[in-house]
């Protein structure tokens, strides 16, 4: 181990920990690769992935972030750390390990589907060892792991709203015990397959109902169909339909959704507006390759809203009218 980067910030908007990857995305394929042949992609994107998607997306929405993640002493790790530092993510609680390889994912989207290939070893230290005492923060965001418990409870006790998600279970066993750390969490943000798998239900709505018994804010993302949520702290329930965009790459879209929801929750918006905003940020990220690096900032959100206001889609203008009050303030903050 070669240590940490810089002096820790005393307080941030959002603290994050989990597994970081270097994502490499090939786009513009007309069909999936066929063994024994070579095909050329029309587009290429790369950048930090995994938990880093959340950090970059939050920074672009104007929130300060601190990330505790392991990086190898290798080119993928150095590239990830460089990009994260350039966008303003605090890496003082991240560590660089000499004898560990930074995970790498290659994403190959093509019409109607995509394929992912990942290389990586288990993290060299536990989340609790990596985090130690989490910094003061308004929110904390975690990829749930068996060793997440202690630091999550410390963050919650210190006043942070803890937002959690899970990764895909390649065994598809979906062991419910893996959700035990949700007792210390404010929100849980699985996709529909994950939610139904862990709750042993057959519809996203049924899964949401079960998850609402476990956390104050339960959210299920449903891909192109949008998202549904229940907030037990306010008694609100809401759904938000997906938005029609020209999809280039879906890598990291769920993470960008989580960042949008976190930012909107910290802003104190009603649940329906939080959900719509998260769907919007996720949808805008689909238009470019590269996961984290495709996450929108306020200028891109403002450009989308300007275009919508000049259409005859009255339902869309009504649903997103709240942006009229939000965008001028946020863009002013950026300057």
Regions found by a protein language model. Give the residues of each.
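Glycine-rich phosphate/adenosyl-contacting loop at the front of the ribokinase-like
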Residues: 1-70, 75-78, 316-335
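Conserved phosphate-binding/catalytic region of the ribokinase-like
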Residues: 1-15, 204-335
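A short, aliphatic-rich alpha-helical micro-motif
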Residues: 9, 134-136, 182-183, 212
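Hydrophobic anchor at the start of a short beta-strand
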Residues: 14, 64-65, 91, 162, ...
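Glycine/charged-rich beta-loop-alpha catalytic/anionic-binding loops adjacent to active sites
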Residues: 32-42, 88-90, 234-245
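A glycine-rich helix N-cap at a beta->alpha junction
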Residues: 83-100
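Conserved phosphate-binding/catalytic loop of the ribokinase/pfkB sugar-kinase fold
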Residues: 96, 105-146
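Conserved phosphate/ATP/ADP-binding segment of small-molecule kinases
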Residues: 156-161, 167-239
């Amino acid at each position: 181990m070669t240590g940490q980067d810089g002096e820790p910030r005393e307080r941030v908007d959002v603290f994050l920990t989990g597994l970081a990857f270097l994502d490499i995305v090939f786009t513009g394929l007309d069909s999936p690769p066929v063994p024994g042949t070579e095909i050329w992609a029309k587009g290429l994107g790369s950048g930090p992935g995994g938990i880093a998607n959340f950090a970059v997306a939050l920074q672009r929405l104007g929130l300060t972030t601190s990330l505790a993640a392991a990086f190898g002493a290798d080119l993928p790790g150095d590239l990830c750390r460089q990009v994260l530092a350039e966008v303003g993510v605090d890496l003082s609680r991240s560590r660089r390990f000499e004898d560990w390889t930074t995970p790498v994912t290659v994403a190959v989207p093509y019409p109607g589907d995509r394929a992912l290939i990942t290389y990586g070893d288990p993290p060299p230290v536990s989340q609790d060892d990596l985090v130690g005492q989490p910094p003061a923060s308004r929110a904390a965001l975690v990829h749930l792991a068996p060793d997440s418990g202690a630091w999550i409870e410390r963050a919650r006790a210190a006043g942070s709203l803890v937002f959690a998600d899970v990764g895909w279970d390649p065994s598809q066993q979906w062991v419910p015990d893996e959700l035990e750390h949700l007792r210390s969490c404010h929100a849980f943000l699985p996709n529909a397959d994950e939610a139904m798998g862990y709750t042993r239900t057959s519809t996203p709505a049924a899964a949401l109902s079960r998850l609402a018994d476990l956390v104050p804010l339960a959210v299920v993302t449903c891909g192109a169909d949008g998202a549904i949520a229940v907030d037990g702290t306010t008694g609100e329930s809401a759904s938000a339909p997906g938005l029609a965009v020209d999809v280039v790459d879906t890598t990291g879209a769920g993470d960008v959704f989580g960042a949008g929801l976190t930012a909107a929750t910290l802003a104190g918006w009603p649940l329906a507006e939080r959900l719509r905003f998260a769907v919007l940020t996720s949808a805008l990220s689909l238009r470019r390759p590269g996961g984290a690096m495709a996450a929108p900032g306020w200028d891109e959100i403002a450009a989308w809203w300007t275009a919508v206001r000049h259409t005859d889609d009255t339902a869309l203008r009504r649903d997103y009218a709240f942006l009229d009050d939000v965008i001028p303030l946020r863009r002013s903050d950026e300057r």
